[in-house]
């Protein structure tokens, strides 16, 4: 140990002296603080459930799209939904439908938890779309109330309770699955795993501490310190979360617990390692305490600030998966650092008073001295060998594949996975997790014109690669509505014509009846023509007789006039007699005179008759002359009717042959389900069934239409995500140049959501990674006071991070055959950035202390002094994080093992070989801009001044320092 170091320890700083003086008080304060925060608020898991935040990125385009669908259709305002699956041993019948109806009534009545039910199976029009091909399963989507995880979980539990308390018929089972149910089960599995993993971790750490220290008391005391740290961190984070300082998530609570255990154990090992080293060097307990504090406090502070700062950089992330990790873990690490710098030294002081922390075995530094000697002797080959080892992991990175399917990372016994497995026996994965496309315009689309455009949109999307099914108003069951193709409409016109052919045949036969009637009429006309000749002859005779009668009547009239003129005076008597009517003779004679007046009238009428007879004799021959043309015309008409009959008969026979099966084309197009010639007439909008379909696929005002799209394969895969942009592109191309051009297009669903998550994760990883690297670099420069050393630390951390993630890919993906979950990359990268610099920092800090002995000697001494401690701490940290593999959430296990592999690589390769070999290769440039001696100064010069100045003072006068060949 150098004199400078001795001088520093001879006058210890005030902080370690205060800690040593008030050690018992500090221990009691920490115990009281831990008890208070754990009694004042519920446990961390309980607070986490009550203050959990939604994992869905609320500002993502896909989430906004789903919410927009719910708004314009007036159905829901959240993105949480579950799927209720009915499965029967036999095809679902009336009992299953009655059970389903009862369940729907219960769900509809619970408006506190249920926002909307997408009841397709309850409507005969769309039932086939929600029923399996074997008729043994059906499903219904239920949208829940709640935009944060706490409300959503309550809604999931309420729906499950209603399903469980509604007795199904024999042979029928009901399951609750879907995204919200899966997230609820994930949180439950994570919370249940914390206690199990913590217990396993405690036992493993206890065993490792026994191996390291060979002392039960030391191991127990370290575990007690770690337990107090863990209790304080858990309680303090729960207290802050309970007061809404920040929100929590399953990942935050799980990672916080193990990070607290691992970091607290690491810091305890750092302190005990340096304390034991000082005791082996012959220092008393108090001096060893100050040496320990001086040698590790800045390392612990730098390590803790690095972890806390790097984790807090996650607060800049947009995804709740990462954002919820930032503040809780950062604050937890600050508490761990505070405990390590106060509680740890206090416990060490109290324990050392009772000689509890004295080393039980001799430290063996020979092996690490040999490693250090080999490194300074062959730094180039050692560095090349470490790079070769790192290349194993780096070469595995290009084969990295990820998945977004949460089901694979949860126990198969979870209710959501059980329900998903039941659904998977009857439905494709994409059918239960469809994409929803919304097209919103500024006018009512309930008309034939816009129906053509909407069908074009559906057709374009359906014919793009990777699409299994598209449901829309023009294809409610995934295929175009039957009888809506133009060929079918034309074919139906042929069917109508065929139905009219029999009527036409009857009318053609009626022509023959008309011909027969015409023949009868012609014959009648011939007879009438002959009879008309006879009538004319008789009429001429009658005319002659009429003339004779008129002459006779005129003569009679004249004679009667003569008679009347003679008897006129007598006649007057008969008209003047008032009582002539009563005298028969008088009245009779008067009547004779009246008869004479009638002869005048008769003569006048006969004259008229003679004139009429003369006219008739003139007209009758003319009338008879018209009959031959009429007979000719009727004969022509008869002949033309016969010709028309023959023509129509031939046409009928030809049509009958051509229209043998007029509906064949329509049936063929219906069977082929070709959607190239869709047309929906205006009359369809009055159809009651179609009106029900409009309510499902068009908004109440008709200005928005939704499409339900099922992808081929699993949408929660990179292949499924790659279909999102083509769907949007096809929709935009379909409405280009149509009345819907300029309409707003929204796309949500499983693949769209994970696409937004993938893009958000890239952004978050970039932002958090750059921020964390910058922060770590600044902290390292402050602590080491060397730009190059800080850059080397950060550079090796980044290299270690890439190699360790590649090793994780190699282990999980290539050896175990399990793809890594999408968030493993981002979380493990940030965590490795945070914890990866600890051991390099401890090594370089020790190297800086020993540099007075020369660069190479300092490397050897630093390796000997820190090798065992850093290896033990790194192994404990790595094993602690790897114990996440016992969690029921395989995601946590993948994150933990990735970090564990990274810490092992960092401890055994980077810190042990790569960093010291780089320091040996760079020499004094490793410490730039600090000025260091490549070789040690003489013992008498070292404490005082630079060699040239001291020699100028001590050497005899006239002897210049340069004459001795001495140099700096």
Curated annotation (Swiss-Prot):
The chain crosses the membrane at residues 22-42, 204-224, 245-265, 297-317, 328-348, 378-398, 763-783, 787-807, 815-835, 866-886, 890-910. It is found in: Cell membrane. Keywords: Cell membrane, Membrane, Transmembrane, Transmembrane helix, Transport. It is a multi-pass membrane protein. It holds the Pfam family MMPL. Gene3D superfamilies: Multidrug efflux transporter AcrB transmembrane domain. One of its GO terms (cellular component) is plasma membrane. InterPro entries: MMPL_dom, MmpL_fam, Mycobact_MmpL. It comes from the Bacteria. Its main location: membrane. Belongs to the resistance-nodulation-cell division (RND) (TC 2.A.6) family. MmpL subfamily. This is Probable transport protein MmpL2.
